[in-house]
Design a protein with these regions (language model features):
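Amphipathic alpha-helical interface surfaces
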Residues: 3, 16-17, 56, 60
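Interfacial segments of alpha-helical transmembrane regions
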Residues: 1-15
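Membrane-embedded catalytic cores of phosphoryl/pyrophosphoryl-handling enzymes
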Residues: 38-125
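Transmembrane alpha-helix/helix-exit interface in multi-pass inner-membrane proteins
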Residues: 14-29
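Membrane-interface interhelical connector segments
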Residues: 25-40
Length: 125
């Protein structure tokens, strides 16, 4: 159940972030705007806003936080936070991009968890 919920959150986050918002906003990446920034990875070719990596990692991590016990729910959130920070450190996102990616993930994980809870909850007669 957790895996299906995480996959639903991840897929919906990808669709919202990469297919809708990125193309609608079309925000250049920091290294495109500020030439003194040298990215530490191969230059991504898509737009900056919102961060797809942050959205993807938190889309799964927040589902884990809600559905898994104890450290098994917290560890993915810590790892997602590290991924979010890395996007800033690598010079490929602005802080607002990372925040927006997190907010999309918060939305998709919440909707996915509620949908799965309704789908798999015992029916009252």
């Amino acid at each position: 159940k957790t895996g299906v919920t995480a996959a639903l959150s991840l897929l919906s986050g990808f669709l919202i972030t990469n297919l809708l918002i990125k193309n609608a906003v079309a925000r250049p990446r920091p290294f495109d705007t500020y030439t003194q920034i040298i990215p530490l990875i191969i230059r991504p070719k898509d737009y900056s806003f919102p961060s797809g990596h942050t959205c993807a990692s938190f889309a799964v991590a927040l589902v884990c936080l809600r559905m898994l016990p104890g450290k098994w729910g917290i560890l993915p959130v810590v790892l997602a936070g590290m991924i979010a920070f890395s996007r800033l450190y690598l010079g490929v996102h602005y802080p607002g991009d990372v925040l927006a990616g997190f907010l999309v993930a918060l939305l998709t994980s919440t909707v996915a968890c509620r949908l799965m809870r309704r789908t798999f909850s015992p029916q009252k007669s």
